[in-house]
Amino acid sequence: MGIKQLSKLLRENSKRGIRERPLVYYSSKKVAIDASMSMYQFLIAVRSGGATLGNEDSPTSHLVGFFYRTIRMVELGITPVYVFDGVPPEIKMKELEKRKERRAAADREYREASEVGDKELMEMYDKRKTKVTGVHVDECKRLLGLMGIPFETAPSEAEAYCALLCKKKAVYGVATEDMDALTFGSPVVLRNFNGTQSKRLPVMEHNLPQILEDLSLDHSEFIDLCILLGCDYCSTLKGIGPKKALGLIKKHRSIGNILKNEDLEVPGDWRYSDAQKIFGSLAEIGEIRDFNISWDSIDRNGIVNFLVEEKGFDLERVNKGIDKLINSRKKGTQGRLDCFITRSK
């Protein structure tokens, strides 16, 4: 879910904190990529024309996306570092259960639309019922390994681990559509990083220090603002929209002071303090030490066996993609990724 309406609030209140850049700007830069978000984007991107299916009628659009988009990044001199979700925090389980219920409802609506042949509704509900599964994750990790592309599995939330990489200056920025990467403290967050290649959209670069300056908030106050807006870890408060949330934080400087001084309807199970702790500390979870992540070798035969023999991809297209990947790596524009993390695949 990310942070509700944060993007809109920042567009209206921090114009200096958001810049449009072409994808080529990130040539020679290292970018941490929220892998789960990328998989979801690739899975729903082909829904209008029907899912891309492999040999056994299993969806392969996530593999199509990871293979060709990653090659395009490498061609541009971008070093992608994919980060996969680890174990979600306990407080997020309620939100995950809600998502499960929404997907089940969407599945029912999809079947009803299918019965009457309403293709527009079918497409809408097909996207809503889409879920990234463990199979998708394992297949993408396998493909990245065969391609020699760096990837990590976070101890918990991928966005938090990506934020840590950025704070440690291991990467230039974090590519995700979830705005809570800012809440976790990532200095730079890149939206439209995947979409820019197919839709020719600019990358929207969010600069956290500039955003905090424009909003006249420190990071702990920004965390409280995001909690008021609505996040994955606790519900929103009735009657609190973006404008009011920002006004309350600027007036009282913390949720604790707001609750002491304002007459608000607060649910008994509103666990805002737990959300504060997660946003304030989750990105620091895990052993930190000097660590070197280098590009691994490209396994052409392994890629062909996986994508062509197992998944039914076109051999000529796959080989052309591998050639592009090899040639781009030979140019020596990628280098090595030196960062301070524990390898956790």
Swiss-Prot record:
Its cofactor is Mg(2+). Its EC number is 3.1.-.-. Residues 1-103 are annotated as: N-domain. Residues 333-341 are annotated as: Interaction with PCNA. Binds 2 magnesium ions per subunit. They probably participate in the reaction catalyzed by the enzyme. May bind an additional third magnesium ion after substrate binding. It is an enzyme of class 3 (hydrolase). Residues 121-252 are annotated as: I-domain. Mg(2+) 1 binds at residues 34, 85, 157, 159. DNA binds at residues 47, 69, 157, 230, 232. One of its GO terms (cellular component) is nucleoplasm. Phosphorylated. Phosphorylation upon DNA damage induces relocalization to the nuclear plasma. GO terms for biological process: base-excision repair; DNA replication, removal of RNA primer. GO terms for molecular function: 5'-3' exonuclease activity; 5'-flap endonuclease activity; DNA binding; magnesium ion binding. It comes from the Eukaryota. SUPFAM superfamilies: 5' to 3' exonuclease, C-terminal subdomain, PIN domain-like. Mg(2+) 2 binds at residues 178, 180, 232. Keywords: DNA damage, DNA repair, DNA replication, Endonuclease, Exonuclease, Hydrolase, Magnesium, Metal-binding, Mitochondrion, Nuclease, Nucleus, Phosphoprotein. It is found in: Nucleus, Nucleolus; Nucleus, Nucleoplasm; Mitochondrion. Interacts with PCNA. Three molecules of FEN1 bind to one PCNA trimer with each molecule binding to one PCNA monomer. PCNA stimulates the nuclease activity without altering cleavage specificity. PANTHER family: FLAP ENDONUCLEASE 1, FLAP ENDONUCLEASE FAMILY MEMBER. Belongs to the XPG/RAD2 endonuclease family. FEN1 subfamily. HAMAP family: Fen. This is Flap endonuclease 1.
